[in-house]
């Protein structure tokens, strides 16, 4: 980690402080994990983003991105490809802002996820048997229908929306805070958190956590540049990303202290 980009921190700090997320997102609590704290001999706090209206932090970035669109772009409608939390977040954000949203999902997406998106007012298009095929079709719709593509993580407004998580953490825990551990997929959440934390409290470590079979950020940090993983794991599908984002890596390479990995067995043990 280097600290050579103060303009980058200033840029994101301003964007985070002016992000529009609380029209739909809530400030989630920091809950003490008593048993885990006792086992580790340390105070462990959990940021309960599972309490958001769509059960994940993704609503923050999606809403902030849509709220920053010009009236002209908003009128064009938006599209994305997702089978997970980004789809739910974008659907709800679009409904709240009165924007037409189309979500392209692979045909293999479980029906409960499809209905979750439809119930929030978005149009669902089932296409392809994999995420890359769904993504390619969503980009085709951009060309054919004139939609605005909303990236799930690699966008400064999305990163800033996710960064409001850090704003809350530092407000809720103003005293001693040694490290913040952040799950990493494409890097939107950790980039937003790292930018805000290093702007205000640079002594706090920001540590990324990835599955050992989907470690795109760890690989990029080691190489000093973005790399493409030859394959990614299937178990932790929400963070199974082959290449870290361009905008997200721009922040992470300077302001993430460390990236650690966990095995599928360790993930399963933690879920239990």
Predicted regions span which residues?
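PLP-dependent amino-acid enzyme catalytic core
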Residues: 1-272
